[in-house]
Each structure stands twice: as structure tokens, then as C-alpha cells.
Amino acid sequence: MNSRFTSAFTPFAVSLGLLLVMTSAFPTPGPLGEDFKNDTTPGRLLLTTPEKTEALIKRMVDKISAMRKEICEKNDECESSKDTLAENKLNLPKMEEKDGCFQSGFNQAICLIRTTAGLLEYQIYLDYLQNEYEGNRENVRDLRKNIRTLIQILKQKIADLITTPATNTDLLEKMQSSNEWVKNAKIILILRNLENFLQFSLRAIRMK
């Protein structure tokens, strides 16, 4: 087989493989009961429907909104000081055009892969929230648990097309700050970006 034929065939094979993964992933809906929500054991097969997964994401978005509001009640300028927030460059996972999650150029398989990878990358930032958030800590614990559950659901849909990134412990140390305002600014920035990330992922979840 010559190289020109191989190079033309490879993208088709990859796309076909992704489509086969997606086709086999969605037709197995099952109940999402209390046992499911309380059990995030790695490797456990989680059966759910796109509607219930969407509801899970919306609950997380509402939780994040409540956490941001809780912080802002203690600081009137927390959401308006964009310059201060911009200085705290945390290299947070974000959706880009190439990730297939935007309305223009939407690709369900690619979007699901990017969503799963991004949520795995967010784990270190959730560790920071767990350590530094001074509001209702139960909200942080619930958010972490729900994101782990969502990651498990999405991993089942994309099979073995993604690997867990290495934990960046150095980043967690670099994020530490004794300045209360800087700390809160980082928390707000993490929550805001995570909320946007989850909202973009909804388009892929809604597709059946």
C-alpha cells in the first residue's frame, strides 16, 4: 500500500472508529438511582440516559453558580475586577473551535473526548478549591463527587480513546497565596471557567 493511499485512509479510519464507539455507547440506558450517585468506584459500569447526564451537568452548573454567589456576597467587586482575575493565569482547560463542542463545526465524538480530558485536567484545580474555599465545604465535596461521576459516564462512551493525565502537584503549590483577594480571585476564575466548560459540553450530551 503506497503512502498516498495510507495518508488518505487514516483520517477515515479514525472517524469511522469514533463513530463505532459512539454508536455502541448510547443505546444502553439504565436507571440513575441513589446507589449510582453515591458510588464513584473506578471501573464500575454506570448506566444512564443522555437526559439524566444532562441533568447532572445542570446541577453542577447550579452548584457552581451558588458558590460564586457565596464568595461575591463577601466582596462586592469580586465579579467586576477583570484585570485582577486576568493576572492570575492558571492555564485552565478551555473549549476551543478544534474541540468540536461549538455550534459551528460541532462533532459529538471529538467534543466528548475533549470534555472528558478537560474534566480530568480540572482535578488539580478542584484540589485547590477543596483546600482554599472558605464557604460551604459541602458544596465543594458535592461538586468533586459529581464531576468524578460524570467522568466515569463519559469514559464509557469514548472507550479507551483517552488516558488520565499526570497529576501536576507543582501547579497546586504555585497556586498557593497568602493574599486573601488573590486567593478568592483564583477560586472565582476556576469556578467561572469550569461552569463555561460544562455548559459547552451539554451539546454533545444532548445528542442521541
From Swiss-Prot:
Residues bearing glycans: 38
UniProt subcellular location: Secreted
GO MF, one example: growth factor activity
Name the UniProt record assigns to this protein: Interleukin-6
Main function: Cytokine with a wide variety of biological functions in immunity, tissue regeneration, and metabolism. Binds to IL6R, then the complex associates to the signaling subunit IL6ST/gp130 to trigger the intracellular IL6-signaling pathway. The interaction with the membrane-bound IL6R and IL6ST stimulates 'classic signaling', whereas the binding of IL6 and soluble IL6R to IL6ST stimulates 'trans-signaling'. Alternatively, 'cluster signaling' occurs when membrane-bound IL6:IL6R complexes on transmitter cells activate IL6ST receptors on neighboring receiver cells.
Domain of life: Eukaryota
Lineage summary: Eukaryota, Metazoa, Chordata, Craniata, Vertebrata
Gene Ontology CC: extracellular space; interleukin-6 receptor complex
Family the UniProt entry places it in: Belongs to the IL-6 superfamily.
Keywords carried by this UniProt record: Acute phase, Cytokine, Disulfide bond, Glycoprotein, Growth factor, Phosphoprotein, Secreted, Signal
Modified residues (Phosphoserine): 81
Cited InterPro entries: 4_helix_cytokine-like_core, IL-6-like, IL-6/GCSF/MGF, IL6/GCSF/MGF_CS
Self-association and partners: Component of a hexamer of two molecules each of IL6, IL6R and IL6ST; first binds to IL6R to associate with the signaling subunit IL6ST. Interacts with IL6R (via the N-terminal ectodomain); this interaction may be affected by IL6R-binding with SORL1, hence decreasing IL6 cis signaling. Interacts with SORL1 (via the N-terminal ectodomain); this interaction leads to IL6 internalization and lysosomal degradation. May form a trimeric complex with the soluble SORL1 ectodomain and soluble IL6R receptor; this interaction might stabilize circulating IL6, hence promoting IL6 trans signaling.
Gene that this polypeptide is encoded by: IL6
